[in-house]
């Protein structure tokens, strides 16, 4: 039988004594003893390794979240709604107040209008807005369209903020607002029993903000528009077991970008694009 040698004694305490015996072999034994300073070095090395690994893991998670956020924002570049079309031929761009929709408050969008990018309500006609001087200190002469008097008028602009009814020249104001066709669809009037009546409007700008100049049973009148949102309604089912009570009558009755669609009864649905 083999015998263990006499252990050599050195100053210090063992960090973790270990003894092992292998069965079915020639019996032998050994002990492992780390000196105190070696144990401390091992602890420091292990702590350093785990700290480095944790730091790398946190860095990886941060970069992953950053990439996910960037890709998400790239997919959702625009808010719901449609900007008014650019109505002027611009030789010089005016100062822009935004770059993307997400620079604008609430549901406002960053739109190219009147030769500059600005935050606008996609559901408002800019030429129907009142004059707004803004809240800075400059004194600049600008032009706005007075929808009540149906003419372009000068006003003093402070140099920032304000709204989209703001033009550099009277000509720009006239070109952008005098003969604008508002968004939306005129309501359908019956063609029977038409009468000859004097027109109460000549174009959309003769009407209040949410009305258009529409042909009716009695000449042209200002009528509340049917707002038609972008996209197409989903296909109707071939057979309906029952017809539900209408939840809407037109697109404007539906929230956000949903449309009023026929699907076993009128209801608000997500459109197809």
From Swiss-Prot:
WAP domain residues: 76-123, 179-226, 228-272
An MF annotation (GO) of this entry: serine-type endopeptidase inhibitor activity
Domain of life (superkingdom): Eukaryota
Localization: Membrane
Listed transmembrane segments: 45-65
Keywords from the named record: Disulfide bond, Membrane, Protease inhibitor, Repeat, Serine protease inhibitor, Transmembrane, Transmembrane helix
GO cellular component: extracellular region; membrane
The protein's name: WAP four-disulfide core domain protein 8
Organism: Mus musculus (Mouse)
């Amino acid at each position: 039988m083999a015998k263990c040698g006499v252990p050599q004694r050195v100053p210090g305490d063992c960090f973790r004594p270990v003894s092992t015996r292998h069965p079915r072999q020639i019996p032998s034994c050994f002990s492992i003893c780390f000196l105190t300073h070696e144990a401390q070095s091992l602890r420091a090395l292990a702590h350093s390794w785990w700290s480095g690994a944790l730091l790398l893991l946190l860095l990886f998670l941060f970069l992953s979240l950053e990439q996910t956020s960037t890709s998400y924002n790239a997919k959702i570049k625009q808010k719901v709604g449609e900007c008014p079309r650019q109505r002027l031929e611009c030789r010089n761009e005016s100062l822009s107040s935004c770059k993307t929709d997400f620079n604008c408050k609430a549901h406002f969008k960053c739109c190219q209008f009147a030769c500059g990018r600005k935050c606008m309500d996609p559901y408002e006609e800019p030429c129907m807005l009142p004059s707004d001087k803004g809240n800075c200190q400059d004194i600049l002469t600008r032009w706005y369209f007075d929808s009540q008097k149906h003419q372009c008028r000068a006003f003093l602009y402070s140099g920032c903020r304000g709204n989209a009814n703001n033009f550099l020249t009277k000509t720009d104001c006239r070109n952008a607002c005098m003969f604008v066709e508002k968004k939306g669809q005129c309501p359908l009037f019956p063609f029977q029993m038409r009468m000859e009546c004097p027109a109460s409007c000549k174009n959309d700008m003769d009407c209040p903000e949410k009305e258009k100049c529409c042909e009716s049973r009695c000449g042209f009148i200002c009528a509340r528009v049917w707002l038609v949102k972008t996209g197409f309604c989903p296909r109707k089912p071939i057979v309906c077991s029952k017809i539900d009570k209408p939840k809407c009558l037109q697109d404007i009755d539906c929230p956000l970008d949903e449309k009023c669609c026929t699907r076993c009864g009128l209801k608000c649905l997500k459109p197809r694009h």
